[in-house]
Amino acid sequence: MCGIVGIVGHQPVSERLVEALEPLEYRGYDSAGVATMDAGTLQRRRAEGKLGNLREKLKEAPLSGTIGIAHTRWATHGAPTERNAHPHFTEGVAVVHNGIIENFAELKDELAAGGAEFQTETDTEVVAHLLAKYRRDGLGRREAMHAMLKRVKGAYALAVLFEDDPSTIMAARTGPLAIGHGNGEMFLGSDAIALAPFTNEITYLIDGDWAVIGKTGVHIFDFDGNVVERPRQISTAAAFLVDKGNHRHFMEKEIYEQPEVIAIALGHYVNVIDKSCRSDSDAIDFAGVESLAISCCGTAYLAGLIGKYWFERYARLPVEIAVASEFRYREIPLSPQSALFISQSGETADTLASLRYCKAHGLRIGAVVNARESTMARESDAVFPILAGPEIGVARTKAFTCQLAVLAALRAGAGKARGTISGDEEQALIKSLAEMPAIMGQVLNSIQPEIEVLSRELSNCRDVLYLGRGTSFPLAMEGALKLKEISYIQPKSYAAGQLKHGPYALIDENMPVIVIAPHDRFFDKTVTNMQEVARGGRIILITDEKGAAASKLDTMHTIVLPEVDEIIAPMIFSLPLQLLAYHTAVFMGTDVDQPRNLAKSVTVE
């Protein structure tokens, strides 16, 4: 959720550290800080709020030194104040930390009983005090680091400076952390994209690893203190891509990138020339499995729900899907089959824990991820990249539709492998997928004016209801989630057939009801539900040309999209939902790219 960077080398580092934090802003944060060491003395600057505030602090009181660590913080333990911002200092020890120390209360009581005086409300400070205690007890720096790691529990990434060692950064992970190799200098980052301005040669630590980093190299140890080797690899992270271009926000840019990135993603899985599935769609033996488990969180979970409809209907493959935070606690009776995990970052803590749970039970693991260098990708048997490129806005847009595109291609591969679709049906499906990017471009180029008018009206509402049937139900949930995330309106979403089971009581003349209803096999039933709503609510109907002609309902507004094949409808119909949320948030003046309390990558449970 936070960002860590570190540099040890031969040039002044304070400004470079702040620059390295900038690509990590997309993760979300509420304070920032930097620490350097010069002439054997630790020094730091911290600021509440954005990096601009930290830059002002550094402008007023610059930091010197060729070694340092820096951090952006999302408050978990303790308020988002300068006092609670990292780095934390204790007796010649400086610490920055991502994640949660789960046993911090127990450790804090123990340390306080021994005389430790805590200056902050954070869990991180116990790490600094533990290290200081072990140094007082006579342990060397490495021994103190190892002893501390034996005591703390949780998912974390750490970077540490010792005041009596002016040439070394120590680091540890049970969460994302990468080491960058430079020319006479070394780098540390919680995301390879932070290191992209400096190097593309990366070593990824694995859970339990800790490292001693000097300007000419790194020594890596496992949890037991044994020296280990981790491979270097060339990272594809590209800092120059993290740019809004001519758009007001990253979210707007990413919405309009969808036709291009979906074309790239589809090209990886289907051959649009001969209209057939590529071998990448066969990385899981769909012909041999009797069932499929899917686990994911947030928007990825909603993509997974749509995937469940597709796999079950078109490939006749039973799917068990659960939110990752609940998945392993349900103790699902897992057969030795396959499991699919969906995550943009590939670092989502709950999803990663579910992946490891399934792996321990002998399942073959597939990962649908955007970050091909992520922990989830590295721990999976088969990786299905969504190829969306960097997504900076916290609210998922292009990652969602690319996840759907990949799941649609996998569904085609599964249907082919299981003999549930014919060769002609495979070709028709891939023809529809191949046409999708152009249709998405047409929609994005045509609907913005009417979306802006609707969004201005929605910005005055406190509540909005979203309805859908079939795959349009998860899409309704996704539309509500997008509006909730970035506008702070409180939308609700339901299966259209559930109106009379409670939700109908919410509807009055002031409530907009957004109904997603392509003219599919569910359309007539959805129209019946809309007739009930029309007696008291204001309907915004999102449908296609055939649906608009057939509905004959008095609506507040009807958004008419092209008539498309059922398999690509979720991707096409997601576009007005994304734009409605975006423009509503813009009219309300919220922080669209970094909404309050939310982070791009949730790396703690």
UniProtKB/Swiss-Prot annotation:
GO cellular component, one term: cytosol
Any one GO biological process: UDP-N-acetylglucosamine metabolic process
Catalytic activity: D-fructose 6-phosphate + L-glutamine = D-glucosamine 6-phosphate + L-glutamate
Domain SIS: 280-420, 454-595
Record: active site: 2, 600
Chief place of localization: cytoplasm
Name the UniProt record assigns to this protein: Glutamine--fructose-6-phosphate aminotransferase [isomerizing]
Keywords: Aminotransferase, Cytoplasm, Glutamine amidotransferase, Nodulation, Plasmid, Repeat, Transferase
InterPro entries reported for this sequence: GATase_2_dom, GFAT, GFAT_N, GlmS/AgaS_SIS, GlmS/FrlB_SIS, Ntn_hydrolases_N, SIS_dom, SIS_dom_sf
NCBIfam families: glmS (TIGR01135), PRK00331.1 (NF001484)
Role, per record: Involved in the production of the root hair deformation (HAD) factor specifically on medicago.
Glutamine amidotransferase type-2 domain mapped to chain residues: 2-216
Gene behind this protein: nodM
Top-level taxonomic group: Bacteria
Listed EC numbers: 2.6.1.16
CDD domains: GFAT (cd00714), SIS_GlmS_GlmD_1 (cd05008), SIS_GlmS_GlmD_2 (cd05009)
UniProt subcellular location: Cytoplasm
Expression induction: In response to a plant signal such as luteolin via the regulatory gene NodD.
GO molecular function: carbohydrate derivative binding; glutamine-fructose-6-phosphate transaminase (isomerizing) activity
Record organism: Rhizobium meliloti (Ensifer meliloti)
